[in-house]
Amino acid sequence: MSSVTTPAPVYTWTADEAIKFLKEWNFSLGIILLFITVILQFGYTSRSMFVYVIKMVILWLMWPLTIILTIFNCVYALNNVYLGFSIVFTIVAIIMWIVYFVNSIRLFIRTGSWWSFNPETNNLMCIDMKGRMYVRPIIEDYHTLTVTIIRGHLYMQGIKLGTGYSLSDLPAYVTVAKVSHLLTYKRGFLDKIGDTSGFAVYVKSKVGNYRLPSTQKGSGLDTALLRNNI
């Protein structure tokens, strides 16, 4: 005897159920979206490093969440058209995520900084202060960079880096590391304000995939590519 297979029932949402779901979860979704919006709006390195790190985590999680959703759409596609678009979106998302990791690893090899895995930018500014390398992300490679010292506190492009420095500690060159090349900025202007404050302006002078001589005597290290733990 042949058994008759009963098709599985297809569940569909009604308008009333959708409205009920929104009413039940509207407050929670609003709070979550407000939190994400505030983080994305005010997450800058020059304002709060803690908020900026949270922003980077949110941006980083976007890729795996997108890939998961596109794969889910492939498995539960409504029809062949949706399936085709879902497959394309999945492939694009995976390729872009792989490219992100490849570029981040290349930048990490160049700088040795975990900021290389920043999902927002591939530009890392580097400054060597008395043998200690500071690396921080910037959105773009500007034509000039400003380094400021206010009562011993070191700032670069408005980002606080450290304390206990004077104008005499500022190097002649700073760099911006990118995935494929290195940008060198030469100090073009230095002005002292008071006894413990002042600023220096660095102007872009060279672009290429090369190394700078070390400022540390006898160390044999390359200043621009110096590994750091800061």
From Swiss-Prot:
Q: Which family does it belong to?
A: Belongs to the betacoronaviruses M protein family.
- Matches recorded under HAMAP family: BETA_CORONA_M
InterPro entries from the entry? M_CoV (IPR002574), M_HCoV-like (IPR044362)
The record's subcellular locations are: Virion membrane; Host Golgi apparatus membrane
Q: Which domain of life is it from?
A: Viruses
PROSITE patterns in UniProt: COV_M
Which residues does the entry place in the Virion surface compartment?
1-24, 77-84
Keyword Phosphoprotein (UniProt): no
User: What sections of the protein cross the membrane?
Assistant: 25-45, 56-76, 85-105
Which Gene Ontology molecular-function terms are recorded?
A: structural constituent of virion
- Can the keyword Nucleus be found in this entry's annotation? no
Tell me what topology the record assigns in the membrane: Multi-pass membrane protein
Q: Which residue ranges does the entry give as Intravirion-facing topology? A: 46-55, 106-228
UniProtKB keywords = Glycoprotein, Host Golgi apparatus, Host membrane, Host-virus interaction, Membrane, Transmembrane, Transmembrane helix, Viral envelope protein, Viral immunoevasion, Viral matrix protein, Virion
Q: What is this protein called?
A: Membrane protein
Cellular component, GO annotation: host cell Golgi membrane; membrane; viral envelope; virion membrane
Q: How does it assemble?
A: Homomultimer. Interacts with envelope E protein in the budding compartment of the host cell, which is located between endoplasmic reticulum and the Golgi complex. Forms a complex with HE and S proteins. Interacts with nucleocapsid N protein. This interaction probably participates in RNA packaging into the virus.
This chain's function reads: Component of the viral envelope that plays a central role in virus morphogenesis and assembly via its interactions with other viral proteins.
